[in-house]
Amino acid sequence: MTERLEVQRAIAADQHAIFRVLCDPRGHVAIDSSGMLMDATGEPVSAVGDTFAVHMDREALNDYPMGLYDVSVRIVTLNPGREIAWTIEGQLNLGHVYGYRLEPIDGGTLVTSYYDWSSVEQSWKDAAIFPVIPESALRATLGILARTVAPGIARPETAAG
């Protein structure tokens, strides 16, 4: 069984405009398709180790009745304009990583969204809670990201179509 999901979308926007959204705590809330992110506080991130708070409500997933809770997002990879990744710290520090890679293409940026839970302890993997977010949610978030940075603009063509 895979322990990583990756999805891609060509977006008709400059990679730096996209990266600004991904570095802004409120940007994470604005593009979230899971319905769990309610609000975020903190400054835009600029380095590995930077953190911000996200106010969560897991009700949208209809799986575990956690109520309202806060997590800390800690940046684990940051290459300006190219890649950003983070892990979640909070009630449980499981070690799963979310991220985006940005690649310039004609007419915009190819954005890869990924979710990796390969470093999670086996006992949590055995609990069958991963992936927490399905591939469809990653795809939907890319659609919302596109709408946020390039509203009404058609996707650029890629080699894959």
What is the role of each PLM region?
Residues 7-9, 70-77, 88, 96-104:
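Hydrophobic/aromatic beta-strand elements that line small-molecule binding cavities or substrate pockets
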Residues 85-140, 156-157:
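Beta-strand/loop substructures that line and gate deep hydrophobic ligand-binding cavities in soluble
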Residues 1-47, 161:
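Hydrophobic ligand-binding cavity/cleft-lining segments
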Residues 11, 58, 115-117:
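Hydrophobic beta-strand positions in extracellular immunoglobulin-like domains
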Residues 12-16, 43-48, 76-82, 101-110:
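A short, structured loop/turn motif at beta-sheet edges
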Residues 40-89, 144-158:
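Glycine-rich portal/gate segments that line the openings of hydrophobic small-molecule binding cavities
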Residues 2-8, 51, 70, 83, ...:
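Intrinsic-disorder/low-complexity, polar/charged segments enriched in Ser/Thr/Lys/Arg/Asp/Glu/Gln
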